[in-house]
């Protein structure tokens, strides 16, 4: 039975050109949609529907139990990819939708005017500025983008009822907005922050507030001392940053405290924020602790600052990949990866900072101070960004961005010959998206000598008129 076979041919190594997240690079999908007859016999093309969509799924809190093995998220029976609605919430964002219909017959005045054996359609689809990157977070959810192509057709001589064939192609989106470089994210310095009871002054600095998910180091410096003017304010305010430094002759009795700083605990946390309505995310956040580090201090706090330096190792890839970062000379244990979830490659299985239409995943650094008097304990939180890219990739990425910006200039000139690139607004949200002009397709007519020669289609001739397909038999050709 004759039916169309659908495939995609990327224009380059990837279907994505430009750098998603950087509008001046014209992030877009460039590929060729190929529709071919499965047996070189004709079919009638009705229309082709093309949809670009992003699917966001966040997991329920109790989706993963605490007794999961180290092989999670692989082969988990309760994974939402099996389609159970009780374990996930799903949102679909449509970025692009278009119906393609042949407006001119392929053979004028002939009964075979819609009989094809193939068609090639160049596709250029602009990616919206806020498109979400491909990611699988084992705790919170996953995000995927698909190019969904459906061909509606009828068989030649097989009646007028339409049939359809579908082709779903995953598009792995990587955003270039968060790069772990001082050029993009400068060091953070916070000075003279008062504790909730106004007894302490804390200063901290973060050298690299944007870190990589892949074995990066977060450099943190903390200093703490007694507040010389604890009664100047009853609640923390912006004036806390202007507290003057005490002199060497400060000998008031209230500073002769025996308060001990027992320990400093640092944690890397990830938060899940779910969209509550069209303009507001949920106020209640689901928290997950990625890693914890405790430093024992056990020292008396005085007017002199106590300074602590931290080098926190960051690795938020999936647990199954952590065994490959061992520096031991022994051969690591062999582990078999049986499958992957919904065709999401392993490099996207990690906890990174993402912003989407349905849910966000953000990260924070938590600094907890524990004293010998429990009422004095307090905590400081500071937002972090965990990037998909590693520090070693930065030179290559920066070079790629420069190349894509240059290519975008030539692309604008090219598409100007077929019309102009238009700015459009997505109907589902306020994101900006570019609409590219349509490029002419290549149509492969049935029984066309040039087409037969192109695809090495040879027939044993039983009908001299070559008009009855039932009397034609394809001769197999070994290539």
Swiss-Prot record:
Protein name: RHO1 GEF localizing protein 1
UniProt GO cellular component terms: cellular bud neck; cytoplasm; division septum
Organism: Saccharomyces cerevisiae (strain ATCC 204508 / S288c) (Baker's yeast)
Disruption phenotype: Impairs the efficient localization of TUS1 to the bud neck at late anaphase.
Membrane-traversing stretches: none
Region (Disordered): 460-479
Record GO biological process: division septum assembly; protein localization to bud neck
Superkingdom, taxonomy of origin: Eukaryota
């Amino acid at each position: 039975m004759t039916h169309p076979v659908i495939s995609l041919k990327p224009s380059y190594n990837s279907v994505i050109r430009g750098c998603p997240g950087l509008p001046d690079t014209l992030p877009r999908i460039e590929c060729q949609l190929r529709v071919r007859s499965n047996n070189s016999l004709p079919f009638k093309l009705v229309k082709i529907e093309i949809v670009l969509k992003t699917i966001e799924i966040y997991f329920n809190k109790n989706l993963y139990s605490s007794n999961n093995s180290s092989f999670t998220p692989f082969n988990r029976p309760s994974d939402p990819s099996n389609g159970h609605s009780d374990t996930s919430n799903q949102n679909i964002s449509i970025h692009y939708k278009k119906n393609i219909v042949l407006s001119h017959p392929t053979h004028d005045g002939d009964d075979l005017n819609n009989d094809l054996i193939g068609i090639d359609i160049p596709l250029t689809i602009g990616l919206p500025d806020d498109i979400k990157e491909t990611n699988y977070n084992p705790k919170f959810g996953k995000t995927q983008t698909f190019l969904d192509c459906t061909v509606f057709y009828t068989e030649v001589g097989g009646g007028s009822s339409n049939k359809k064939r579908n082709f779903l192609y995953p598009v792995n989106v990587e955003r270039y907005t968060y790069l772990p470089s001082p050029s993009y994210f400068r060091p953070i310095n916070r000075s003279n922050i008062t504790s909730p009871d106004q007894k302490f002054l804390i200063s901290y600095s973060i050298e690299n507030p944007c870190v990589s998910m892949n074995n990066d180091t977060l450099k943190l410096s903390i200093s703490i001392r007694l507040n010389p003017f604890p009664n100047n304010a009853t609640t923390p305010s912006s004036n806390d940053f202007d507290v003057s430094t005490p002199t060497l002759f400060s000998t008031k009795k209230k500073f002769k405290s025996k308060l001990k700083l027992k320990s400093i605990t640092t944690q890397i946390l990830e938060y899940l924020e779910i969209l509550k309505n069209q303009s507001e995310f949920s106020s209640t956040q689901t928290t997950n602790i990625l890693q914890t580090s405790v430093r024992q201090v056990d020292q008396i706090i005085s007017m002199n600052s106590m300074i602590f330096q931290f080098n926190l190792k960051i690795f938020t890839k999936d647990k199954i990949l952590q065994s490959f970062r061992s520096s031991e000379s022994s051969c690591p244990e062999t582990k078999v990866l049986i499958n992957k979830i919904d065709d999401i490659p392993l490099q996207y299985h990690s906890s990174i900072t993402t912003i989407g239409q349905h849910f966000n995943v953000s990260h924070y650094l938590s600094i907890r101070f524990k004293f010998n008097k429990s009422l004095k304990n307090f905590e400081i939180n500071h937002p972090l960004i965990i990037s998909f890219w590693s520090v070693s990739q930065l030179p290559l990425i920066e070079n790629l961005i420069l190349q894509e910006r240059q290519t975008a200039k030539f692309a604008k000139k090219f598409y100007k010959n077929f019309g102009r690139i238009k700015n459009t607004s997505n109907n589902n949200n306020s994101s900006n998206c570019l609409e590219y002009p349509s490029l002419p397709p290549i149509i492969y007519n049935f029984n066309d000598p040039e087409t037969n020669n192109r695809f090495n289609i040879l027939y044993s001739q039983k009908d001299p008129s070559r008009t009855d397909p039932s009397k034609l038999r394809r001769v197999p050709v070994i290539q």
